[in-house]
């Protein structure tokens, strides 16, 4: 089983994250941020990755530290669970509709972290959640997972739908990219013989 647990404690947050890449999409998420919990539940369900997140953050300041630090810890957990990355599919692309919105998420589990994020929100907030934090989370996740990630909303009008289509798109892309390719026979999917450089 490809699993990992990460604990991260700073003066701003205390976070524990666990993942099982070969799970069934079970989630147990408690960050204290309702909308964010919803997005992480969706990520687990549609990626079929079991995700557990417990976060205690300085929400009296704002949601930034908790959101970013969960992205850091979850990215680290995925990277650790991938291990040598032998046999993985590596590349994947997902187009994700959410009513009037369509987003595209493309991933390369390359070991070379990068985020390209072309998403615009018509509103500054979704409930009490700052929409700019969606990018912060994706960046923290991509950098710490060691993946190249392109996220683009092709069109959309509702901020909730836009965010949800991005998280669901990541879920479906991750599901395909971390899957073991039976034809790869345990090989690292790179002509270099290694990923990450």
UniProtKB/Swiss-Prot annotation:
EC number: 4.2.1.19
Domain of life: Bacteria
Pathway terms, separated by semicolons: Amino-acid biosynthesis; L-histidine biosynthesis; L-histidine from 5-phospho-alpha-D-ribose 1-diphosphate: step 6/9
UniProt record, GO biological process: L-histidine biosynthetic process
Subcellular locations according to the entry: Cytoplasm
InterPro entries: IGPD_sf, ImidazoleglycerolP_deHydtase, ImidazoleglycerP_deHydtase_CS, Ribosomal_Su5_D2-typ_SF
Gene Ontology CC terms: cytoplasm
Record key words, sorted: Amino-acid biosynthesis, Cytoplasm, Histidine biosynthesis, Lyase
MF annotations from Gene Ontology: imidazoleglycerol-phosphate dehydratase activity
Reaction(s) this enzyme catalyzes, per UniProt: D-erythro-1-(imidazol-4-yl)glycerol 3-phosphate = 3-(imidazol-4-yl)-2-oxopropyl phosphate + H2O
HAMAP family for the chain: HisB (MF_00076)
Family affiliation: Belongs to the imidazoleglycerol-phosphate dehydratase family.
Protein name, UniProt field: Imidazoleglycerol-phosphate dehydratase
Organism listed in the record: Nitrobacter hamburgensis (strain DSM 10229 / NCIMB 13809 / X14)
